Regions:
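Short linear capping/connector segments at secondary-structure termini
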Residues: 1-2, 111
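Helix-loop-strand module that forms the ligand-binding subsite of alpha/beta enzymes
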Residues: 2-92, 96
Length: 185
């Protein structure tokens, strides 16, 4: 027994849900996927065709319409192709779930460089964008597409990113991190 029953109740009562997960193998983490799978009891087992789409009807008819936002960060510097699996999953989630609507997608590429002090301005800009988006969704019920796009600007070239990432892995800290996670065969 765990707290999933309580989490489903909390989720049902929320006006807005923010799903946030680092990008792992082009999708959400295993823990997030398990959580999403365990939301299935919030739907009835029957079939419903709505707007040409077959879905399960929502179990709780008194639940209100609910919006959700997706946030994910990746070590790779490009949004294109890297977030496709995650995007597809949540767009299907939105189209197959009654009373839910995807209100925004925030993808943060090249997140691993955020820890470097030289990228403090970028980190501050991202924080400001997220705060503005939060205010927009509460006050206006939507997020400006330009705001979502602004988050994806890494402000560095892919070549610079690659060089910095590779240099980290060549350092003693990088080697220790890598070797600690790799099993000996």
């Amino acid at each position: 027994k765990d707290d999933m029953t309580e989490l489903r109740i909390t989720l049902r009562e929320a006006d807005l849900v923010i799903y946030s997960s680092p990008l792992y193998i082009f999708n959400v983490t295993g823990i997030m996927k398990n959580f999403l799978d365990r939301l299935l009891p919030n739907m009835k087992p029957y079939m419903l065709i709505k707007d040409g789409q077959t879905m399960h009807p929502h179990r709780y008819e008194d639940d209100k319409e609910q919006g959700f936002v997706v946030f994910s960060a990746s070590g790779f510097p490009e949004v294109e192709h890297n977030f496709d699996g995650l995007t597809s999953s949540f767009r299907c989630f939105s189209s197959h779930m009654e009373n839910t609507s995807l209100m925004g997608e925030f993808f943060l590429p090249a997140a691993e460089v955020m820890a470097h002090p030289v990228y403090k301005k970028r980190k501050d800009k991202i924080s400001e964008i997220c705060q503005t988006a939060g205010k927009q969704i509460v006050n206006e019920g939507k997020i400006d597409i330009d705001l979502m796009s602004a988050l994806t600007d890494t402000e560095i070239t892919n070549t610079t990113f690659q060089s910095q990432a590779d240099n980290f892995w060549k350092t003693l800290d990088g080697k220790k991190s890598y070797l600690k996670e790799v099993p000996k065969l």
